[in-house]
Amino acid sequence: MTPMGTNYGETSGEMSNRHMNYYSLRAKGGTGLIILENANIEYPAGSNGTSQIRIDHDSFMPRYYQLVENLHKNGATVAIQINHAGASASSARTGMETVSSSNIPTKVGGEVPRPMTKEEIL
């Protein structure tokens, strides 16, 4: 199953009970590979919304562990899509400068991001 943003995340970035049920039903239905939706790797700068799940801190791992154990018990293999919103992030929402790989906005009239330096990327 390809990663699809459900927008079920808690405002804290935790996976909700709704997430747990959503993915569990797919594993029980016979899905062999489940790729979890885009998880933020740098909060708040890399966030693409208030309902995006996070994986930028160890405090989120117990919930992932619980989900993965459940999915494995139901026969599914699990992967996750990691995400940094880059130019799609909004400085109005994050309160931080928008950065990306270039200064090209993601849409016409969109916020112009600051290109990251090689040192920032490494």
Go through the PLM ranges and name each one.
Residues T2-L122:
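Flavin-dependent oxidoreductase catalytic cores
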